[in-house]
Amino acid sequence: MKNWLFVAVVFAMPGLAIAQGAKSCLTPPEAEALVTYALPSVIRAMTTRCTPVLPATTALIQSGPVIAARYQVDADKAWPAARVAFDKISGLDFATTVGEPAAKGLIEVLVGAGLSEKVKPTDCPKFDRIVDILQPLPTKNMAMLITTLMAIDTADRQKKPPFKMCSTPVSGE
């Protein structure tokens, strides 16, 4: 079974994998900042994408806007680190080039559009279940979980992640 959380977040950064330089990698805190910044856009995009196919009583439809608003608080705080991470993998000083508000908006649009392209309506019930299970988690824990799942999902495969994460030493060694 596909890791639907991975699909939902890997979502969203279709152009990042293409633009990323082979030697650029993100540390876990950088990856977590980027994911934290993307979470509200992911939830909003999934809510929009899945509203036509899910019952109104589902967690995503009922709670999606509230979850996105809750995640937005932390996303705003994560922006400076997310910007650095985005610049690192894109090889651009994006916010300086296009301006801070435009950079934020463009990244949010890329995330939402990328997700909408990748998620099929038949995936919506799976994403709804994930949201229902994980919605109590704080944003930081969600970002840590997502980046850890991304590392696991791409570690031994030929999959191309939306961004490369630097390998980290095993704790306790």
For each predicted feature, which ranges?
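Surface-exposed, polar helix/loop patches in the mature regions of secreted/periplasmic/lumenal proteins
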Residues: W79-M150
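Sequence contexts marking disulfide-bonded cysteines in secreted/extracellular proteins
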Residues: S24-L26, R49-T51, P121-F127, M165-S167
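Sec-dependent signal peptide recognition
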Residues: K2-V10
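Early exported N-terminus immediately downstream of N-terminal targeting peptides
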Residues: E32-A82
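Glycine-rich, aromatic-bearing surface loops/beta-hairpins
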Residues: Q135-E173
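Boundary at the C-terminal end of the N-terminal hydrophobic targeting segment
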Residues: A17-G21
